[in-house]
Amino acid sequence: MKNVFLDFEKGIEEFEAKIEQLRFAQDNSALDISAEITRLQAKSQGLTKSVYAKLTPWQISQVARHPLRPSTLDYIKHLFTDFEELHGDRNFADDRAIVGGLAHFNGQTVMLIGHQKGHDTKEKIYRNFGMPKPEGYRKALRLMRLAEKFSIPLITFVDTPGAYPGIDAEERGQSEAIGKNLYVMAGLRIPIICIIIGEGGSGGALAIAVGDTSLMLQYSVYSVISPEGCASILWKSADKASDAAEILGITADRLKEMALIDTIIPEPVGGAHRDYPAVMQSVRQALQESLRKLQDIPLETLLQKRLDRLLGYGRFKINKPD
């Protein structure tokens, strides 16, 4: 699929267009213009580094939503072997916005669960734009319990704008399904690694993101509400989304400062969508290290640390004036 450039990448897009024109000309000419192509590539790379070194939270949210950004199934394809997808919640239906199943990671069996948005329009519609309904969360819950039954580590991939807000989802118990997952994940007797790979939208993300360690890609976002949603509530206009993104503290750096995530996984220059092999290697290393650390901790200690971690959220200290 052809690369898609964001609004703040216009200069980069112009360089890339010139490079493509020269490549086409070289293929159809006896002239050697490789030196000029190399020069433009260096300029494009330099500009990309400059732009991405000073991204605003709002711009980072756009990168997190990039249509070519690696999805759960992309990570499964590149990092795991022998993936066997498991379907259905055994109650109502199979929600395609949630994918999950058994796989091998470096020879070890793991359970994988993740949101799946899709890359093009057809797939996005098929996956309901990554917005799960109650049956999706109940499918995830079924797989979590299966992993616990066989003492298999759980790895979840978070990438959703939020849980589906439709009437049918509410009628089938959307809030109950999310709440049940939070409750069960808090006590699952297996190691749990959660990784935010794109958007972490509100309870729809949190329903598969309660674990022992939280990893987050550099240009992902994680928040109780989208910047547009927040702006619509506070200022009655989505035009204030950039201001809302700043206030919400949705970026990996801000969340790490507040101890809401544990590890920031670096992305290639220009974002994960520009270099799949590089980001896959970074995620692989982070998963290997996290899994090794968690499996070295005795189970009862792991569960107590998880409980302490959850109960510690939201605590703050007020310094009284003398």
From Swiss-Prot:
EC number(s) per entry: 2.1.3.15
Keyword annotations: ATP-binding, Cytoplasm, Fatty acid biosynthesis, Fatty acid metabolism, Lipid biosynthesis, Lipid metabolism, Nucleotide-binding, Transferase
InterPro entries on file: Acetyl_CoA_COase_a_su (IPR001095), ClpP/crotonase-like_dom_sf (IPR029045), COA_CT_C (IPR011763)
GO biological process, one term: fatty acid biosynthetic process
GO molecular function annotations of the record: acetyl-CoA carboxylase activity; ATP binding; carboxyl- or carbamoyltransferase activity
Origin: domain of life: Bacteria
Gene3D superfamilies, sorted: 2-enoyl-CoA Hydratase, Chain A, domain 1
UniProt GO cellular component terms: acetyl-CoA carboxylase complex
Pathway(s) annotated for this protein in UniProt: Lipid metabolism; malonyl-CoA biosynthesis; malonyl-CoA from acetyl-CoA: step 1/1
Location within or outside the cell: Cytoplasm
Catalyzed chemical reaction(s): N(6)-carboxybiotinyl-L-lysyl-[protein] + acetyl-CoA = N(6)-biotinyl-L-lysyl-[protein] + malonyl-CoA
Major enzyme class: transferase
Domain CoA carboxyltransferase C-terminal as annotated: residue spans: 30-293
Predominant place of localization: cytoplasm
NCBIfam families: accA (TIGR00513), AccA_sub (NF041504), PRK05724.1 (NF004344)
Subunit comment: Acetyl-CoA carboxylase is a heterohexamer composed of biotin carboxyl carrier protein (AccB), biotin carboxylase (AccC) and two subunits each of ACCase subunit alpha (AccA) and ACCase subunit beta (AccD).
Family statement drawn from the similarity comment of this UniProt entry: Belongs to the AccA family.
Chain's role: Component of the acetyl coenzyme A carboxylase (ACC) complex. First, biotin carboxylase catalyzes the carboxylation of biotin on its carrier protein (BCCP) and then the CO(2) group is transferred by the carboxyltransferase to acetyl-CoA to form malonyl-CoA.
Protein name: Acetyl-coenzyme A carboxylase carboxyl transferase subunit alpha
Organism encoding this protein: Nitrosomonas eutropha (strain DSM 101675 / C91 / Nm57)
Gene transcribed to yield this protein: accA
